[in-house]
A protein has these predicted regions:
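Beta-strand-rich modules
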Residues: 1-9
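Lectin-type carbohydrate-recognition ectodomains
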Residues: 22-184
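Extracellular fibronectin type III
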Residues: 9-23
Length: 184
């Protein structure tokens, strides 16, 4: 973060610090996990959900904070028995289910407006039997189809346009499969 100074009578000796704008936006997300319920908000590549505990993700909320650009984050999930949600959720609305014991099987996430012009949104999931899949970005599908396998965890990152994609061992979690979406 940086600070902006306001000068009184044009001299620096009379300046006061005003909190400035931190130019790095954040992506924040939380998941509803089988038996555990809603987890706390995670951000910027932290793992939300579980892995190694055989618990399904049932719902997800995603939002942006600290944005210097217009636009939003939109997302939709592939839900057990229902398939892909017909509409996109955005800005913290819940995608998936709560209280229905339905697993999430895949997800798509995209940015809109100026955010989409300046950032890519990367995400990857921990899928039952496959582990961490490769990174998907900008609306691509991440997860499985035709297997009836649950999502167990997710990581989401904002990356400035033109910057390198996240590594396959981001956050110490090693990618098990380079595919982002596995269909039967």
């Amino acid at each position: 973060a940086y600070r902006t100074r306001a000068y009184v009578n044009g001299t620096s000796s009379n300046s006061i610090a005003i909190p400035g704008y931190n130019s790095q936006p954040n992506v924040m997300y939380k998941t509803h996990v089988q038996s555990f319920g809603w987890q706390n908000w995670k951000q910027n590549g932290d793992c939300s959900g579980t892995f190694g505990k055989s618990k399904r993700l049932e719902g997800i909320n995603i939002k942006l904070s600290n944005c210097g650009y217009s636009g939003s984050v939109q997302y939709r999930t592939h839900i057990q028995s229902y398939g892909w949600e017909s509409g996109w959720k955005q800005d913290g609305a819940m995608s998936g289910t709560s209280g229905q014991a339905k697993r999430l099987e895949a997800i798509q996430i995209r940015l809109t407006g100026e955010m989409a012009q300046h950032y890519d949104i990367y995400y990857r999931v921990h899928a039952q039997h496959f582990g961490w899949l490769g990174w998907a970005k900008n609306g691509e599908s991440s997860g499985t189809a035709g297997y009836a396998y649950r999502l167990e965890g997710i990581q989401i990152l904002l990356v400035p346009k033109g910057a390198a994609a996240p590594a396959s061992n981001y956050g110490g979690m090693i990618q098990n499969n380079p595919n982002t979406f596995i269909a039967r």
